[in-house]
Amino acid sequence: MPAWSCLVTGAGGFLGQRIIRMLAQEKELQEVRTLFRSFTPKHREELSKLQTKTKVTVLEGDILDAQCLRRACQGISVVIHTAAAIDVFGAIPRQTVIDINLKGTQHLLDACIGARVPVFIYSSSVAVAGPNSYKVIIQNGSEEENHESTWSDPYAYSKKMAEKAVLAANGSTLKDGGTLHTCALRLPFIYGEKSKFISDTMDRALKNNGLINGFSRFSVISSVYVNNAAWAHVLAARGLQDPKKSPNIQGQFYYISDDTPHQSYDDLCYTLSKDWGLRPDSSWKPPVALLYWFGFLLETVSFLLRPVYNYQPPFNRHLVTLLNSVFTFSYKKAQRDLGYEPLVSWEEAREKTSEWIGSLVEQHKGTLNIKAQ
């Protein structure tokens, strides 16, 4: 493979940081260009350590700033687009989520065409495929089955439309007459050290006498360790630049997971944290059907109040469905086309994540000791 350069959006995020670390190991890579809305001093320090391996350029900017994106794409061979507003709880205004996820992606595709960037890889989500009903079971689904979300929820909707835009852009003519090649990686729940979801879950559990309070005991999901998710992006970048592999990858989407056992969100969090004395809350939980219809009631209240008050319900039907569905996918197509195999085993991923959770437990104990003094 000839020398190449790569722009990673969302570079300060959970996934983006891991992708950058892996890209820095690529021998032919001349530059990693990192784009994020605002890097912390710690982020900058970590990026500076990679300078000994490859050139790392740090850019701060907004994914909705078209001029910023045009500058960021100049002289780049590959764009890996991970920047996104991830929100299934309704905490972020609907239009903001759609703007970041859809309009931002469209701006970036336009920037790639103008800057003659030939490869675009999109970090998509299994949310674009559903689940549409907690009553429908999908086990080891494949790309050929064409599952598609029917929810109007802003996250699922915006990711679905952005993925469609990315795949439709495959074959577009670049400003210099070249061709843009694209693909999308549909990621499930990503876990690992520094996962905000797990960190927040552990924080609530530690404040609740070690009880993990969840509402997803009926779900069965695919999940992926963060390093394995990052590795799939590196392989996609290699593949779309390989004349032999690229024709099979262009315009395709891939489900990405690993060998983490299919289980509920609650069970996964418990498995990762049980060494530190955390345990599931076994108290009574409402039936899923009741939660679903209560979610509908909350949505109705929110709709009726909208002219005078912006009421954000604590949950809705979409969230209830997400947390209580059997919804798993196979990564065989990624194995075939990308040569994807998980870098990190389930056992190693569990151990590393558990050790990190242990550090959170120790921090919590330290905070309690300080408060007691």
Curated annotation (Swiss-Prot):
UniProt cross-references to Gene3D superfamilies, sorted A to Z: NAD(P)-binding Rossmann-like Domain
Pathway(s) where this gene product acts: Steroid metabolism
Any GO MF annotation of the entry: 5-alpha-androstane-3-beta,17-beta-diol dehydrogenase (NADP+) activity
Membrane-topology descriptor: Single-pass membrane protein
Active site as annotated: 159
Domain of life of the native organism: Eukaryota
GO cellular component: endoplasmic reticulum membrane; mitochondrial membrane
Catalytic activity as recorded in UniProt: a 3beta-hydroxysteroid + NADP(+) = a 3-oxosteroid + NADPH + H(+); 5alpha-androstane-3beta,17beta-diol + NADP(+) = 17beta-hydroxy-5alpha-androstan-3-one + NADPH + H(+)
Keywords: Endoplasmic reticulum, Lipid metabolism, Membrane, Mitochondrion, NADP, Oxidoreductase, Steroid metabolism, Transmembrane, Transmembrane helix
Entry's EC annotation: 1.1.1.270, 1.1.1.210
Expression (tissue specificity): High levels in adrenal gland, kidney and male liver (at protein level). Low levels in female liver (at protein level). Expressed in ovaries (at protein level).
Record's subcellular location: Endoplasmic reticulum membrane; Mitochondrion membrane
Binding-site list for NADP(+): 10-15, 155, 159
Main location, first listed in the record: endoplasmic reticulum
GO biological process terms, semicolon-separated: steroid biosynthetic process
InterPro entries: 3Beta_OHSteriod_DH/Estase, Lipid_A_modif_metabolic_enz, NAD(P)-bd_dom_sf
Parts of the chain that traverse the membrane: 288-308
Role this protein plays: Catalyzes the conversion of dihydrotestosterone to its inactive form 5alpha-androstanediol, that does not bind androgen receptor/AR. Does not function as an isomerase.
Family stated for the protein in its record: Belongs to the 3-beta-HSD family.
Protein name: NADPH-dependent 3-keto-steroid reductase HSD3B3
Species of the source: Mesocricetus auratus (Golden hamster)
Record gene name: HSD3B3
